[in-house]
Regions:
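N-terminal low-complexity, intrinsically disordered segments
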Residues: 44-78
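Short, well-ordered loop/turn elements at secondary-structure boundaries
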Residues: 44, 175-177, 226
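Sequence/fold signature of self-assembling virion shell proteins
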Residues: 2-33, 39-42, 50-55, 80, ...
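Signature of extracytoplasmic/envelope-associated structural regions
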Residues: 4, 115-156, 249-253
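Long, contiguous amphipathic alpha-helices that act as assembly "spine/axial" helices in icosahedral shell
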Residues: 50, 76-138, 170-185, 230, ...
Length: 318
């Protein structure tokens, strides 16, 4: 007489087994805020004004000549709190009763919503640098070009582009310490496969204090070339097609080169009108618990002289 077998007792066998652990998404690091001069001295209003004073002039003096008194040039830098964003989710009472994973889902709401807002912040900061320059223009400052297309084959990056970025920052009187390059993964691929660059790569960050102090902690550091600590970001703005000084790029991305010297030298300025704030409440009419994270912020390119944008094609890694 046959005993119990799997074939004859399928109704007693669990065909599908469910893991207690929920598969998490792989998340990259968000650190653009490290390069922002954050301000907080605003009790009310939507627009921040920051006055500036120009340089004094020097003139030749001759005897019996009246001195000419000049006024210093002045300016006013403005930026607005232009982003008011939220992330919201809800979970029904029935789902709480029915789902084995209900507690895990509820616990994930605040951190996932906060993460979503910070991705929006990261994207906004990086986009503001590109928006702060004039497209299809060299954006020349003191004779140095602050926006140009990569000089390599197919608008890829080359060692010459690093030298040009350093030259432009020097002409703009930017401190050449704490130099940082934030590049697209396609640029990292190009750099890692160019024989003439591999020998110039330093495997450790040159600006050790930046890593120690947290200025660039979290970015995926690659190597150092010509004084630039190179980091990779997936959130750099795409520029599509653009022609600068008769050189064109298609499927372009904006890569940034600048000095991360702390204080007033930082290339970006910005602040939060409302820090990410979490709200939760039960909606008795819909029989669901609602979770909301909301924030208001504004960012802008603060020092155009401390920003060199090199446009490269993402096709370089294809």
């Amino acid at each position: 007489m046959a005993g119990m077998t799997s074939a004859g007792n399928q109704h007693l066998i669990r065909t599908d087994l469910w893991s207690r652990q929920i598969k998490e998404l792989l998340l990259d690091d968000l650190n653009a805020m490290k390069f922002v001069r954050m301000i907080s001295d605003f009790p009310d209003g939507q627009r921040i004004n920051s006055p500036s004073i120009g340089e004094a002039e020097v003139a030749d003096f001759n005897e019996n000549m009246a001195i000419k008194y000049n006024a210093l040039d002045t300016g006013n830098f403005q930026f607005n709190f232009d982003a008011y964003k939220y992330s919201a989710n809800a979970i029904s009472e029935k789902f709480k009763r029915d789902s084995y994973y209900a507690s895990d889902v509820i616990a994930a709401f605040p951190q996932r919503e906060h993460r979503a807002l910070m991705v929006a912040v990261e994207t906004d900061i990086l986009a503001k640098a590109n928006a702060g320059q004039t497209a299809s223009n060299l954006n020349t400052i003191n004779g140095g070009n602050h926006r140009f297309v990569g000089s390599g084959t197919g608008a890829s990056i080359t060692l010459n582009d690093f030298a040009r970025a350093r030259y432009s920052l020097t002409k703009a009187q930017v401190p050449l310490n704490n130099l940082v390059a934030i590049v697209d993964p396609s640029v990292a691929f190009t750099l890692g496969t160019q024989a003439n660059l591999v020998n110039l790569m330093t495997p450790n960050p040159q600006w050790q204090s930046m890593v120690r102090d947290g200025n660039t902690t979290g970015f995926k550091f690659m190597f150092n070339i010509m004084g630039f600590d190179i980091y990779i970001s997936n959130y750099l703005p795409l520029v599509g097609s653009e022609t600068i000084n008769s050189v064109s790029v298609t499927n372009g991305v904006a890569n940034y080169f600048f000095s991360a010297s702390p204080g007033d030298t930082m290339p970006w300025i910005g602040g939060f009108r409302q820090m990410p704030t979490v709200y939760s409440e039960f909606n008795k009419d819909l029989q669901q618990t609602e979770h909301l994270t909301i924030a208001e912020w504004g960012f802008k390119l603060y020092r155009p002289e401390n920003m060199v944008t090199i446009l490269t094609s993402t096709n370089a890694a294809a």
